[in-house]
Every structure is written in structure tokens, then in C-alpha cells.
Amino acid sequence: MKRICVFAGSSAGNHPAFARETKALGEAFARNQIELVYGGAKSGLMGVLADSILAHQGKVTGIMPTRLFEKEIVHRGVTELIEVDSMHERKAKMSEMADAYIALPGGFGTFEELFETVSWAQIGIHQKPLALFNIEDYYTPLLELINHAIEAGFVPESNRSLIKEAKDPDRLLSELVKLG
């Protein structure tokens, strides 16, 4: 596994564990020589992860639409910055470059990227592993909702395996590498 796309919040959230564990994930990326592919911002958990990887001599590729350069405050210190025209192009490029996906805590944008990636896996557009970094049980309510959707007959039980989950950065990467 060479590259992992990470979806993450453009804010750091209100619990110190979000940033602390994101930094630890960055160290694990660098230690395992896995390149980060992400949205290209220097703010929030996106920036925390990129900075951690760069501080440990890892590689980071940011992908951002031109019109978001000011709003998301583009990270100009990344190894490679790819400028695209639209959010659709950003997501397509991130997916094209990635061998796997991780979702860190985040808001609507993170949820949208996560669910689009899961939907693509469900219909066979890709077979790349996907995992949630469940810091402070951030994603536990979402996992419960997914289980509820399975019980209600809206998601096939076999598709539950499309989303892995871990609370430890090394275990998270180990699971993805094993699946990839």
C-alpha cells in the first residue's frame, strides 16, 4: 500500500484527542512510508495530519479546487499540491491516486466523501479498503446507524464489511494494508 486518501475535518473539533490521535496517525503514515492524499488544507485535522507526516519526513499530496484556496487556506508546504477546477475533480483525483481510504472525524464534507466512497464500493466502482479512525468513539453513532439500516433492510448485511473501524493508528493501518 503506497497511498491512502484521508477525509478529515477542516476544523480540529473540540476534544484534544482528535488532534493528538491525528498526529499519531501521521507518525504511523511516515513510519510505514505511506503517502497521504487529502484535500490540501492546512487547517483543522487535515492540517494536523499533513504537518505530522511532513515533520516525520513523509510524503503528502494535497488536491484542492482553485476557488477553495482562500476559504480552506491551502497548505503550501505539502510535497505536491494539485490544483483542480471543481470538487468533483478533487474527489475523482483523490480516488484515482489512493490505494485505500480513511475517514477521520469531520463534518458534512467528510461525511459526503465517506458515503460517496462507500457507495462506489457497494456498486463495484472500486474495491479499495475503507476504514474509520474512531477517535473518542466519534463514529460509533454512525456505525450504529449503519447497523440499523442493515436491520431495516436498506443495506445488505454483506456490505457491512465495506467499512472497517479502529481506534488505534497502527491497528488502523495494519488492517488496511492487510485488506489492500
What does each of the following model-derived ranges do?
Residues 1-97, 135-180:
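A cross-family phosphate/adenosyl-ligand binding-site feature
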Residues 54, 121-128, 154-155:
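Arginine/glycine-rich "motif VI" loop of SF2 helicases in the C-terminal RecA-like domain
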Residues 91-123, 131:
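Active-site/ligand-binding-proximal alpha/beta "capping" segment
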Residues 123-141:
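Short, positively charged, low-complexity/disordered linker segments
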